[in-house]
Amino acid sequence: MRILLSNDDGVTAPGIQTLAAALREFAQVQVVAPNRNRSGSSNALTLESPLRSETLANGDISVIDGTPTDCVYLGVNALMRPRPDIVIAGINAGPNLGDDVIYSGTVAAAMEGRHLGFPALAVSLDGERHYDTAAAVTCRLLRMLSDAPLRSGRILNVNVPDVPLTAIRGWRVTRCGSRHPAQTVIHQQDPRGKPLMWIGPPGAKQDAGEETDFAAVAAGYISVTPLQVDLTAHGARGRLAEWLGRVDKGGAAW
């Protein structure tokens, strides 16, 4: 099995390095990751400037000022030959639950892999301690996928409780929960008295019902949420068409 491994925390982050070491026990792994932390970069793609890569002493490839999406795009189309069998993003330092997934560079890296035609996993740890637990979970999931391929055409967003492996209670297939809108802005000044602003923490949980990823991880279960690239709200199309037909009295005459 050939694995392209990326993340949004940076090429030397403990999560990606722990996972790379575990995966190399049974697979060929090429790390292609940002040279620095790019958390929260979502699906950003660098189009206005060239990108430079650097191969580190251990064979990992660092993309200078690249986003996670850049890294997967370059990994698939230029830097990993032969191409990978699967794209994995992680292990992220901290969870990617609920509507956090729309901001997550980790999830975006997996989404780019899926968009380019490959099976893809995003793996996050609900903390920054037990990376070995998340690595073991990922390896087990990969072996299961190898033995019985899941041809769902979806990204699997995996969130692992930050506990020893022996404390994991099992798997749960979940849906994304949601948060209240975030509103906090932290105001500061630079040494010259100019204003600075920091984006504050995420909003509090709004929907953390039993079937959500929030609830699964809080209860000690591994949350596995199938995600898709198609953002169309298919159930709303009929209502939208009816509304347009009813309120647009001018029809096609502009």
From Swiss-Prot:
Catalytic activity: a ribonucleoside 5'-phosphate + H2O = a ribonucleoside + phosphate; a ribonucleoside 3'-phosphate + H2O = a ribonucleoside + phosphate; [phosphate](n) + H2O = [phosphate](n-1) + phosphate + H(+)
Major site of localization recorded for this protein: cytoplasm
Keywords assigned by UniProt, alphabetized: Cytoplasm, Hydrolase, Metal-binding, Nucleotide-binding
Domain of life: Bacteria
Keyword field contains Cytoplasm: yes
Assigned GO CC terms: cytoplasm
Localization, UniProt: Cytoplasm
Cofactor note: Binds 1 divalent metal cation per subunit.
Listed EC numbers: 3.1.3.5, 3.1.3.6, 3.6.1.11
Gene3D superfamilies (UniProt xref): Survival protein SurE-like phosphatase/nucleotidase
GO molecular function annotation: 3'-nucleotidase activity; 5'-nucleotidase activity; exopolyphosphatase activity; metal ion binding; nucleotide binding
Positions with a binding annotation for a divalent metal cation: D8, D9, S39, N92
Family: Belongs to the SurE nucleotidase family.
Designated name of the protein: 5'/3'-nucleotidase SurE
Organism: Edwardsiella ictaluri (strain 93-146)
